[in-house]
UniProtKB/Swiss-Prot annotation:
Claim: Ion transport is one of the keywords in the record: no
Family annotation (Gene3D superfamilies): Poxvirus poly(A) polymerase, N domain, Poxvirus poly(A) polymerase, nucleotidyltransferase domain
The gene coding this protein: OPG063
Protein name: Poly(A) polymerase catalytic subunit
Catalytic reactions on record: RNA(n) + ATP = RNA(n)-3'-adenine ribonucleotide + diphosphate
Subunit-structure text: Heterodimer of a large (catalytic) subunit and a small (regulatory) subunit.
């Protein structure tokens, strides 16, 4: 029987806090379930909603000025959400409401509210790069890799983009400047800061407080537009979350990384924004070309890739003094694949102190083998490399999340061989190891190459797990 508690049964202060929050006397079950939430409930109850409404209105005026909604509508949506618990009787939903309201009252001002106050002066730090000089070289490199055969019968998943992306991008530009210790960007927008001719869609980010930021942003969009916003977590992408609207249109996504990982990611400073070092991004691009899907993307829009490649090549030429003369030495390093055990052996002794690298195509197998080695010095760089690295007895052990392309039966395609070399170089950059000679040889090994057809490719490692999501409208959190 679900009875209401009387005021003599429970401590008066706790009961009063819960009663004030719910706008009613709690049931016995509600009381016992919510009494440990009284601290959060108190913060929500005393939170100044008027100041919060003002901050959201300012955010709307600055970043969403073209969205047709009135100040009174915004206020009504905010007050409605902060009183939602009074009409909710499901304990699970009450916990969700408390958790999300707690995020708003404790973090919104410092994360998004601060974007409305006067910003520090922008420190202009751009260098003039001669990207045009690299366009022909980039085109030649990419042309030799444009070997994917498009299966016209293959059904491609559609990536629907919200009309709010341009508004969120405007907000993100300011966010990246204000929070440049905890949030950095990579991808097309970061290269646009170097070369304004680059086209970009949404802004790709790495940050240390991704979940909190995305929740705050989701509510900002909800309060301004009135739309139901959903946050999704994808199991096969590490620490990745995406915001979509009620029609499944993509708004923004983010990878979360630890602060110690953030500290070692190579980055450069442009106009008060930190971007992932384009050298590192170039290595990631070379690595990703081992993925058959990425080669299919190249086949569909080579000019998009050419603009990015030329920008990064000019950056490494200017920054590292790379000479593009075709001298490749021992690049790409020799790669031998064991297709049955799904391990590639890369001969590294010509460049590094470890004599070889065992590249696993199944992450669970690598984890098991590392345990068997009884070694505890592995480095996990999370989504930055999608892999751990371990050097033990002069052998590097690592995981490669992409496909391996074969040019013949049992023979690693040179595109994948370069991708594996790039994967090893990412580790060198992250650990401040030597990489420049290897980088020079790797880039020169991409020059003047003939197209080599793809014979076959390995399958990607299958990732398991359930999708997580936060549905604000339905008060559901599943993680």
């Amino acid at each position: 029987m679900n009875r209401n508690p009387d005021h003599n049964t429970f401590p008066n202060i706790t009961l009063k806090i819960i009663e004030t929050y719910l706008g009613r006397l709690p049931s016995v079950n509600e009381y016992h379930m919510l009494k440990l939430q009284t601290r959060n409930i108190q913060k929500i109850t005393v939170f100044n909603k008027d100041i919060f409404v003002s901050l959201v209105k300012k955010n709307k005026k600055r970043f969403f000025s073209d969205v047709d909604t009135s100040a009174s509508e915004i206020k009504d949506r905010i007050l409605s959400y902060f009183s939602k618990q009074t009409q909710t009787y499901n304990i699970g939903k009450l916990f969700t409401i408390i958790e999300l309201q707690s995020v708003l009252v404790t973090t919104y001002t410092n994360i998004l509210g601060v974007l409305t106050i006067k910003a520090p002066n922008v420190i202009s730090s751009k260098i003039s790069y001669n990207v045009t000089s690299m366009e022909e070289l980039a085109r030649d490199m990419l042309n030799s890799m444009n070997v994917a055969v498009i299966d016209k019968a293959k059904v491609m998943g559609r990536h629907n983009v919200s009309s709010l992306v341009k508004n969120v991008n405007k907000l993100m530009e300011e966010y990246l400047r204000r929070h440049n210790k905890s949030c950095i960007c990579y991808g097309s927008y970061s290269l646009y800061l170097i070369n304004p001719n680059i086209r970009y869609g949404d802004i790709d980010i790495l940050q240390t407080n991704s979940r909190t930021f995305l929740i705050d942003l989701a509510f900002l969009i909800k309060f301004i537009t009135g739309n139901n916003i959903i946050l999704s977590k994808i199991p096969y992408l590490r620490n990745y979350m995406v915001i979509k609207d009620e029609n499944d249109n993509h708004i923004i996504d983010s990878f979360n990384i630890r602060q110690d990982t953030m500290n070692v990611v190579p980055k450069i400073f442009i106009d008060n924004i930190y971007i992932v070092d384009p050298t590192f991004q170039l290595l990631n691009m070379i690595k990703m070309f081992s993925q058959i899907d990425r080669l299919e993307d190249l086949s569909k829009d080579p000019e998009k890739f050419n603009a990015r490649m030329a920008t990064m090549l000019e950056y490494v030429r200017y920054t590292h003094g790379i000479v593009f003369d075709g001298k490749r030495n021992n690049m790409p390093m020799k790669c031998i694949i064991d297709e049955n055990n799904r391990v590639v052996t890369v001969t590294t002794k010509d460049y590094f102190s470890f004599k070889k690298c065992l590249v696993y195509l199944d992450e669970n197998v690598l984890s098991s083998d590392i345990l068997d080695l009884n070694a505890d010095t592995s480095c996990d760089f999370e989504s930055v490399t999608n892999s751990v690295y371990l050097i033990h007895d002069n052998i590097m052990y690592t995981y490669f999340s992409n496909t391996i392309l074969l040019s013949d039966k049992g023979k690693v395609h040179e595109i994948s061989a370069r991708g594996l070399c790039a994967h090893i170089l990412l580790y060198q950059m992250l650990t401040s190891g030597a990489y420049k000679q290897c980088l020079s040889d790797l880039l020169n090994s991409m020059m003047n190459r003939d197209k080599i057809p793809i014979y076959s490719h390995t399958e990607r490692d299958k990732k398991h797990g359930r999708h997580g999501f936060i549905n604000i409208e339905k008060d559901i959190i599943v993680f």
